[in-house]
Regions:
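Short Pro-Cys-Gly-centered "Cys-loop" motif that presents a nucleophilic cysteine in a tight turn
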Residues: 1-24, 37-179
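Short Gly/Ser/Thr- and Asp/Glu-enriched loop/turn motifs at secondary-structure junctions
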Residues: 27-31
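Short beta-strand motif characteristic of blades in beta-propeller domains
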Residues: 32-36
């Protein structure tokens, strides 16, 4: 728990320092998922600062020597509203997918920031797309309904869009964002 708290504190500081907005996150025992808005193309610098700073802190705190992270971070652009929604849901469902607990029971993801409205994550965009907190809860629950035998199936962009439209009573996500 302490390591996760230190990592989140560092993440918030580094994101602020590099003008990167956090959209969603989930800290897992062996990996981290981040969804960010990087308007100034600072993601690489932010990640370098975050990972090296956290590694130094971790090594000092624990007496560990050497690398803390196994590999360089991977990133990909998000080019549609549908994919954005799919990623937010995928990130928050990681603990359930790993058999740890339900998304709403896991304290090391941004799920609670969407529901409670506090924290380091910029929730405005996603909440506007899904109809606020109640829409977010319904949209998140739809991911649980897709589990079959404990295994998640990944949504295609069109499936994510169809799910969003169904959960939003026929409104398009892009229409909600424009409200």
């Amino acid at each position: 728990g302490e390591d996760y708290a230190v990592f989140l504190e560092s993440l918030g500081s580094c994101a602020d320092e590099h003008s990167v907005s956090l959209i969603a996150y989930c800290l897992m025992p062996n990996h981290v998922h981040l969804l960010v808005r990087d308007g100034d193309d600072e993601l690489g610098e932010m990640m370098r600062s975050l990972l090296s700073g956290y590694a130094q802190s971790y090594n000092k705190r624990t007496g560990h020597v050497g690398h803390v992270f196994q590999q360089r971070f991977k990133s990909c652009p998000v080019e549609s509203d549908e994919y954005l929604l799919q990623l937010v849901r995928y990130i928050h469902e990681n603990p359930a997918k790993a058999g740890i607990c339900k998304a709403e029971e896991y304290w090391w993801s941004s799920y609670h920031e969407y529901v409670a409205g506090s924290g380091r994550v910029d929730t405005k965009l996603v909440l506007s797309m899904v109809g606020g907190v109640s829409g977010f809860k319904r949209f998140s629950k739809a991911a649980v309904d897709r589990r079959v035998g404990g295994v998640f199936s990944r949504l295609s962009d069109s499936e994510a869009h169809e799910t969003a439209v169904r959960e939003l009573d026929g409104l398009l996500p892009s229409e909600l964002k424009a409200l």
